[in-house]
């Protein structure tokens, strides 16, 4: 931890929340942090045991499942440096999970897509995650699950609006 780093640096242009919102925003911030922690803990024993995908690779493959993207597009969507995306995709290509192909729109850019092995691996990861979620949410009604999905979708869209990082390329 670097005590000289100010976590509020760069936030000067963002107005501070109204005092009446602070408690609610703190509750949302805590809930979001705990959701990430709990989801990771629910699925990490299976991932470690099976040598499965880490969270960044899982996110990258999930995004590429929708449609092929270039390194620059992946970096923009994931909010990480292109050199990091390049290293990550190189390992996944070497493992036979992704393949590069020429961009049909021309130019020198190459796109990435899942191979059949990559699709099977991603489907397996998704099954692990769905089993863990199914266990955690056992007893929730279909209506409650639909409402949770709707609110989380809305929350994600608000985060995208605030960050400028879009899941879509």
Which residues does each predicted region cover?
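Alpha-helical initiation/capping and key positions within long helical/coiled-coil segments
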Residues: 20, 24-27, 77, 84, ...
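A general structural signal for short secondary-structure boundary/capping elements
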Residues: 82, 105-110, 156-162
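N-terminal leader segment of winged-helix/HTH proteins
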Residues: 1-55
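Amphipathic alpha-helical dimerization/coiled-coil segments
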Residues: 27, 31, 42-45, 127-164
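N-terminal helix-turn-helix DNA-binding core of bacterial DNA-binding proteins
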Residues: 40-85, 89, 94-95, 111, ...
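Charged, amphipathic alpha-helical coiled-coil/dimerization segments
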Residues: 6-8, 90-146, 150
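Generic structural concept
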Residues: 29-36, 57, 61, 65-68, ...
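Helix-centric, low-specificity signal for extended rod-like, repetitive segments
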Residues: 19, 30, 80-81, 93, ...
